[in-house]
Amino acid sequence: MISQLRIYTINRGMMDSWLKLFHEHLKPNHEKYGIRINASWVNEERTEFIWVRSFDTVGDIQAKEAEYYSSPERIALGVQPQTHIAKTEVRIVEPTAP
């Protein structure tokens, strides 16, 4: 298994609407297209949204993302996700134990 640690800096005043968008649309659609969401957090200042999503292999990332981003559900969201996010950091991480 391979995971992505994703850290989004959310635009000021938009965290509540981001969380609603994430939980009502983004998370279910990721999971529908085979991208597992392991956990999500908000930092103490409520400026960063941190989440982990997982794939079976590194090779699955590109294929699963292409399927997700071209889905009718994601297309219908338009630029809503991008309007919330000021900065994105993505790190590929692997478990240290089986």
Where are these regions (language model features)?
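Absolute protein N-terminus
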Residues: M1-I2, P98
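Short, structured motif recognition centered on aromatic/hydrophobic residues
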Residues: I2-R6, W18, N29-H30, F49-V52
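Short beta-strand-to-loop capping motifs
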Residues: Y8-I10, R53-T57
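Hydrophobic small-molecule pocket/channel-lining residues, especially in calycin-type beta-barrels
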Residues: N11, L26, P72-L77
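Short amphipathic alpha-helical segments
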Residues: M14-N38
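Short amphipathic alpha-helices within nucleic acid-binding modules
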Residues: D16-W18, T57-Y68
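Residues within well-ordered alpha-helical secondary structure of globular protein domains
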Residues: L21-E24, E67-S70, Q80-T83
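Glycine-rich beta-strand-turn "strand-cap" elements at beta-sheet edges
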Residues: Y33-I50, D56, E73-P98
